[in-house]
A protein has these predicted regions:
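Short coil/turn segments at secondary-structure boundaries
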Residues: 4-13, 146-153, 410-414, 476, ...
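Conserved catalytic alpha/beta cores of large enzymes that bind or transform nucleotide phosphates
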Residues: 52-149, 154-157, 196-201, 221, ...
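Acidic, glycine-rich flexible loop/linker segments
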Residues: 157, 169-173, 193-196, 201-224, ...
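Structured core elements
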Residues: 22-26, 38-41, 52-55, 149, ...
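Conserved phosphate/anionic-ligand binding catalytic regions in large, soluble enzymes, centered on
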Residues: 28-74, 148-173, 253-258, 328-349, ...
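Extended, highly charged
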Residues: 1-46, 57, 109-143, 147
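Conserved alpha/beta-domain cores
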Residues: 32, 137, 307-644
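Beta-strand scaffold of nucleotide-dependent catalytic cores
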Residues: 35-44, 48-104, 161-167, 175-178, ...
Length: 644
């Protein structure tokens, strides 16, 4: 007759005195000498069903389930795992400050221990163990024919993995996917706490700090629950909270699981919420901005966009997305799409890697101790600093490719300008000061330069890992800002030299269908410089497709500085000169058997420009996710008007 049991029976209309108990007895896996955790056979935040999500920490599993530690997190992609690939698409190290172990003597059977710093900075599972657990999870899911929530343990004495519990996942599995619901912040303010976002909603209200069960009766409906961790007995008050914020825990902790079931936003593992948020303070809790949940001071404005997809009819022109943030990719995968026409890797480099590649390559030679210390902090657990860059790059790109699989994902190799590269840790040691970086050392000219070729080779190696190790053959690559055919040849030769040799054949390219990945690699080029179009026949001999970069093409055709507001009024992609170039490119590329796409908001913002492109027979249009639905409807109307 605990609060939780009484509440459950009330919800289910069970008689309090007409229930029975059962007791299961099973061998205890000695994970106190190993590790343990939980597995979900889908992405718990988005409901993406092609993922196995594994959480793991040292010691007995109770700390992971209760959210008392921030565990390691691993993501495995099911479709290519089933084909025999090592499809680990993400590895994130948790802080793992403490663990639960058996107690020797005393009243309590278990006790809490601190984790050795060396163990905190290494993963709790190796790749073989991650893949074994993922395969078991897929077998269990296929047996029960539904997404599953699984607990597992690694016995440190026997050196064996065990599955100790499996039950149906009860939140995302119930969603129909017919109505898209998106919460959007309309204001920003002072951020007072950050942690892992649970769900994608926004909640707000007065904060109430609950230290222990004795204070539960103080909690009022609509308040924001702020606490160290939650306990199963707290579920009656969690139901009436507008949001939940905890100091400890990960995405599979008790607070996270119950929040998802209740449809309440939660930010877990903040570390400092109970100190940063005062009782009675009005706060807004946002889980709608990616994997990082934010607690803002004050009641900020937000909105909820709902779209019914029941009768949605896609256009014949491929509508693709512009994607950058791997943490949002699985949410965006539910939008109607035909893949990604521009995957921007700059976001991965600046937000996940944060270090200039040459600073990692030259780590042993660095004399700037400040830079070296920053690198040490970010690369904790990596003896090989170059491997850190390669792994982070591959995991970021791998998640983008997996989210939109089996449709094509076109990755643009890094297109930072020198001033942007200088902003990375160690970047000022390697980057020149240019008067106009927009027109300077960027794109293809970097890749074959002796001072950057090693750095570029890491990008190539990461793409090779994504395609050949993870099995994500839907990933293709694109070379930006390639001024001449000679530059194009140099870059393709470097790509081949560093391991990406399995190029698609012209015959395979001709027969290739979007949504049916094949092993051959496509290498596209951005058509963003007039020379790309004026020499289209020569570029077509080197590359497998063209992607129009309308911003740079407009800038370079009209001689505009696109960062200058003073001359922005002069023209955009609808200018006759720009359209004339596009009108040359599309039929010329088609005559050579190559496809042409465009990246940018023009077709969405200007219906007449969209009609112009469809009339020319453009193969794909890539847009920001928030305009995909609107643009799809507009392009379908244009196709109907033109009788396509």
């Amino acid at each position: 007759f605990t609060n939780r049991a009484i509440s459950y029976r009330q919800d289910k209309n069970y008689d309090h005195f007409n229930v029975a108990l059962s007791v299961a007895v099973q061998k205890m896996a000695r994970s106190d000498r190993g590790s343990s955790g939980v597995i979900f056979t889908l992405d718990t935040e988005s409901g993406f069903k092609d993922l196995v999500l594994i959480n793991s920490s040292w010691g007995l599993g109770e700390f992971v389930v209760k959210g008392m530690v921030t565990p390691d997190e691993f993501k495995v992609f099911k479709p290519t795992l089933k084909k025999g690939f090592k499809s680990i698409i993400s590895k994130r190290m948790g802080s793992k400050e403490k663990k639960l172990v058996y107690a020797h003597g005393g009243v309590e059977p278990t006790t809490e221990q601190g984790v050795d710093p060396v163990d905190r900075h290494r993963f709790t599972l190796d790749d073989g163990q991650i893949l074994k657990l993922a395969k078991w999870a897929v077998i269990i899911e296929e047996h029960y024919q539904r997404p599953m929530d699984i607990e597992w343990a690694y016995d440190g004495f026997m050196q064996e993995l065990f599955v100790v519990q499996a039950r149906p996942e009860t939140v995302q599995a119930r969603k129909t996917g017919k109505v898209l619901e998106e919460f959007v912040m309309e204001q920003t303010g002072k951020i007072i706490a950050k942690g892992a976002a649970v769900g994608a909603k926004i909640g707000q209200g007065k904060a109430r700090y609950i230290k222990d069960a004795s204070q539960l009766s103080d909690f009022q409906k609509g308040e924001v629950l702020v606490t160290e961790i939650t306990d199963p007995d707290w579920e009656p008050i969690m139901k009436i909270a507008s949001a939940i914020v905890t100091n400890a825990g990960g995405r599979t902790s008790h607070a996270a699981i119950v929040s998802r079931e209740l449809g309440i936003p939660a930010v877990v593992g903040t570390g400092n919420a109970t100190e940063a948020i005062s009782g009675g303070m009005e706060v807004t809790v946002s889980c709608a901005e990616g994997e990082v949940g934010k607690v803002y001071e004050g009641l900020l404005k937000f909105r909820v966009d709902r779209t019914d997809l029941t009768n949605f009819q896609p256009p014949k022109t491929d509508i693709k997305m512009i994607a950058a943030d791997p943490e949002l990719a699985f949410n965006y995968s539910f939008l109607p799409h035909r893949g990604v026409g521009l995957a921007r890797v700059e976001f991965v480099i600046s937000n996940f890697i944060k270090i200039h590649p040459n600073a990692l390559i030259d780590y042993e030679k660095l004399t700037d101790m400040g830079v070296k210390q920053q690198i040490d902090e970010l690369t904790a657990g990596y003896k090989d600093k170059v491997q850190y860059y390669l792994d982070k790059f591959a995991y970021g790109v791998g998640q983008l490719a997996a989210a939109f699989y089996p449709y094509d994902v076109l990755l643009r190799f890094s297109d930072f300008k020198s001033n942007e590269y200088a902003g990375l840790i160690g970047g000022k040691l390697y980057e020149p000061i240019e008067e106009n970086p927009m027109m300077g050392w960027r794109g293809a000219s970097r890749y074959y330069d002796p001072s950057f070729e090693k750095a570029f080779s890491l990008e190539v190696a990461a793409v090779k890992k994504v395609r050949e190790e993870m099995g994500l053959w839907n990933l293709s690559v694109m070379v930006p800002f390639c001024r001449t055919p000679e530059e194009g040849k140099k870059v393709v030769e470097i790509i081949n030299r560093h391991g990406l040799t399995n190029r698609i054949t012209p015959e395979a390219r001709k027969n290739k269908k979007n949504g049916e990945p094949i092993e051959g690699l496509e290498i596209w080029v951005m058509a963003e410089i007039p020379s790309n179009i004026l020499q289209v026949d020569e570029f077509a001999e080197i590359f497998d497709g063209f992607s129009i970069g309308s911003n740079d093409l407009t800038q370079l055709t009209l001689g505009l500085d696109r960062d200058s507001k003073l001359i922005a009024h002069i023209g955009n992609e609808r200018n006759k000169a720009v359209q004339k170039l596009i009108g040359i490119l599309i039929p010329a590329a088609h005559a050579k058997g190559l496809k042409v796409g465009i990246c940018g908001q023009g077709p969405s913002d200007f219906p007449d420009f969209g009609e112009f492109l469809v009339g020319l027979g453009i193969d794909s249009i890539s847009l920001n996710p928030d305009t995909v639905l609107k643009a799809s409807i507009n392009i379908k109307a244009v196709e109907d008007k033109l009788g396509r």
